[in-house]
């Protein structure tokens, strides 16, 4: 992931010169309950999908006293789109299909932060809030309306929530864990009879070993 195609080309050039492999770590594609969600969508358990809503409201940058760093700079790729949005938009593409119409609103709520080891304040140019309205094209004839809300300044926010509503039922994948972005997910399914079920991942999606820190491994 980069902020320009020229940077991607430069990374590819450097990797080839040094005989290195380059990949993007969209780790949520390996998290068991995300794999379970993908399986259920592909099995058409929800029927025609009417609405997708993805909220990712985290508080990692909610303290205005947190030091200024590269994350505060738009030109360095800082901001909630780079931190959360890249994963959110990859999820939507993976689960449902291509996003073809996008409109949005960005905001910088905390406009200055203290420099490290200093009381001096420096400008913040990167966004800490993003709202997006999206139309997704998939196998069905109808475009799927989708709404995305991202925030890194939502202290005690609701965390991650993906709601999928269809003609035959709904799925809700969520986690309120503010300390670990990978652990703590749960998945609920309800059909047209309004029976809500807590779902677990198929054993084939689980890993033999897990780590307590979700940054080390996606399970």
PLM regions and their residue ranges:
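C-terminal glycine/acidic-rich active-site capping loop/insertion
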Residues: 115-116, 122-123, 130, 137-141, ...
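Glycine-rich phosphate/pyrophosphate-binding beta-alpha loops
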Residues: 86, 149-157
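Beta-strand-loop-alpha-helix segment that lines the small-molecule cofactor/substrate pocket
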Residues: 1-29, 44
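Predominantly a Rossmann-like dinucleotide-binding segment in NAD(P)-dependent oxidoreductases
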Residues: 20, 28-124
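Hydrophobic alpha-helical segments typical of transmembrane helices
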Residues: 7, 87-91, 218
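A short helix->loop->beta-strand "cap" motif at the edges of active sites that frequently abuts
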Residues: 18-20, 139-145
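A short beta-to-alpha transition loop/helix N-cap that caps and shapes the active-site region
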Residues: 4-6, 58-64, 111-114, 155-156, ...
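Short beta-strand segments
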Residues: 25, 53-54, 103-104, 133, ...
